[in-house]
Amino acid sequence: YIDEETMHLHHDKHHQTYVNNVNAALEKHPEIGEDLESLLADVESIPADIRQAVINNGGGHLNHALFWELMTPEQTAPSAELAAAIDATFGSFEDFKAAFTAAATTRFGSGWAWSVVNKEGKLEVTSTANQDTPLSEGKTPILGL
């Protein structure tokens, strides 16, 4: 359970700050012209003078945007395809939840727990520090907390 005050803090303060800061960094290099996901998937392509700001704030924006997109007041089940992949990878949905919980609760300091599709097209559970995004590791996030 996450309380309403925490949700407002993350949406109205944290997420908005990430958006403002990444936009300010990108304004310094309008020639980049790529979308944020593409930039974070290839961080070496980001000009050095704004690279860390884009990684930190762009990651914060994308991480939170996915989080908001996936939020629902209703409990939902994975699609049949995702459920089959979870069973094939983790053995059961309960084992997946245990792995995801471990990724979230063992992260030292701030960060995110993720369910991702890796470069081989397989599911995995991982975590990233601070506002780092799995996109920078060549992984596609499908669930983040």
UniProtKB/Swiss-Prot annotation:
Its EC number is 1.15.1.1. Mn(2+) binds at residues 10, 64. InterPro entries: Mn/Fe_SOD, Mn/Fe_SOD_C, Mn/Fe_SOD_N, Mn/Fe_SOD_N_sf, SOD_C_sf. Fe(3+) binds at residues 10, 64. One of its GO terms (molecular function) is superoxide dismutase activity. One of its GO terms (cellular component) is cytoplasm. It catalyses: 2 superoxide + 2 H(+) = H2O2 + O2. It is an enzyme of class 1 (oxidoreductase). It comes from the Bacteria. Keywords: Iron, Manganese, Metal-binding, Oxidoreductase. Destroys superoxide anion radicals which are normally produced within the cells and which are toxic to biological systems. Catalyzes the dismutation of superoxide anion radicals into O2 and H2O2 by successive reduction and oxidation of the transition metal ion at the active site. This is Superoxide dismutase [Mn/Fe]. It comes from Streptococcus parasanguinis. The lineage of its organism: Bacteria, Bacillati, Bacillota, Bacilli, Lactobacillales.
